[in-house]
Amino acid sequence: MEDYIKIEKIGEGTYGVVYKGRHRTTGQIVAMKKIRLESEEEGVPSTAIREISLLKELRHPNIVSLQDVLMQDSRLYLIFEFLSMDLKKYLDSIPPGQFMDSSLVKSYLYQILQGIVFCHSRRVLHRDLKPQNLLIDDKGTIKLADFGLARAFGIPIRVYTHEVVTLWYRSPEVLLGSARYSTPVDIWSIGTIFAELATKKPLFHGDSEIDQLFRIFRALGTPNNEVWPEVESLQDYKNTFPKWKPGSLASHVKNLDENGLDLLSKMLVYDPAKRISGKMALKHPYFDDLDNQIKKM
């Protein structure tokens, strides 16, 4: 830790305090995440350290790079590249009545998908994607932060400040208690973020797991074994769920064109096996008119 100087506290993440810091010799500005674990006495589990060490190898222009993993007083510090703005702050800064430029929505979505495809190809899931952990710079680049931390540390129910971890971007298979889930959980999250890029509003903003599920069901219809084989046997599925009929996504997401809505609907398919993959999403006609500079990144 002696290599880094803490400059100021910049936020509170899912796992602990985040500081802006500086490397003593190079002067490089970094983000320092202090990981606060549930069981402080036992120190950091070796499995977590193994998992985290693997993340140093995830090098991609759309992934926030993990530069160092340090221990101090049995606390774990993760040293990341520094970006000052996250997508939530950016969306909140857009004046009322105005929206993000549609070409920027497209560019950000494409970059998010590129980052996710890279990680999925290395068998790393994110599991907790949300606007707060998508970081942006002033050159139009967006990067995914906190990759792989969910697997290393688990996703707590509450942030250590007692703020509840958001459910708004969580996939239906996770909400319904599926024990086996894979890369489609991240695609669902990206779909909900895509809608929010277009409208500035969360697509499904539930305040409990059941409220979250019912908001999804009201928009997309209550799933059954016909549309999603075996959904009725998932741990938290109840036959007593109200049977809503599918509505139209267009009524919830007014600022997307036909191709955008088509891609969104493919990302929000109930059956994870039928949900579009990141790789296929990148080939969708929605991106046909995207600037080639972005496609080459």
Swiss-Prot record:
It is found in: Nucleus; Cytoplasm; Mitochondrion; Cytoplasm, Cytoskeleton, Microtubule organizing center, Centrosome. SUPFAM superfamilies: Protein kinase-like (PK-like). The modification N-acetylmethionine is found at M1. The modification Phosphotyrosine is found at Y4, Y15, Y19, Y77. The modification Phosphoserine is found at S39, S178, S248. GO terms for biological process: apoptotic process; cell division; cellular response to hydrogen peroxide; chromosome condensation; DNA damage response; epithelial cell differentiation; fibroblast proliferation; G1/S transition of mitotic cell cycle. There is a cross-link at K6, K9, K20, K139 (Glycyl lysine isopeptide (Lys-Gly) (interchain with G-Cter in SUMO2)). Its EC number is 2.7.11.22, 2.7.11.23. Its main location: nucleus. InterPro entries: CDK, Kinase-like_dom_sf, Prot_kinase_dom, Protein_kinase_ATP_BS, Ser/Thr_kinase_AS. It is an enzyme of class 2 (transferase). Phosphorylation at Thr-161 by CAK/CDK7 activates kinase activity. Phosphorylation at Thr-14 and Tyr-15 by PKMYT1 prevents nuclear translocation. Phosphorylation at Tyr-15 by WEE1 and WEE2 inhibits the protein kinase activity and acts as a negative regulator of entry into mitosis (G2 to M transition). Phosphorylation by PKMYT1 and WEE1 takes place during mitosis to keep CDK1-cyclin-B complexes inactive until the end of G2. By the end of G2, PKMYT1 and WEE1 are inactivated, but CDC25A and CDC25B are activated. The modification Phosphothreonine is found at T14, T141, T161, T222. Belongs to the protein kinase superfamily. CMGC Ser/Thr protein kinase family. CDC2/CDKX subfamily. Forms a stable but non-covalent complex with a regulatory subunit and with a cyclin. Interacts with cyclins-B (CCNB1, CCNB2 and CCNB3) to form a serine/threonine kinase holoenzyme complex also known as maturation promoting factor (MPF). The cyclin subunit imparts substrate specificity to the complex. Can also form CDK1-cylin-D and CDK1-cyclin-E complexes that phosphorylate RB1 in vitro. Binds to RB1 and other transcription factors such as FOXO1 and RUNX2. Promotes G2-M transition when in complex with a cyclin-B. Interacts with DLGAP5. Binds to the CDK inhibitors CDKN1A/p21 and CDKN1B/p27. Plays a key role in the control of the eukaryotic cell cycle by modulating the centrosome cycle as well as mitotic onset; promotes G2-M transition via association with multiple interphase cyclins. PANTHER family: CELL DIVISION PROTEIN KINASE, CYCLIN-DEPENDENT KINASE 1. This is Cyclin-dependent kinase 1. It comes from Rattus norvegicus.
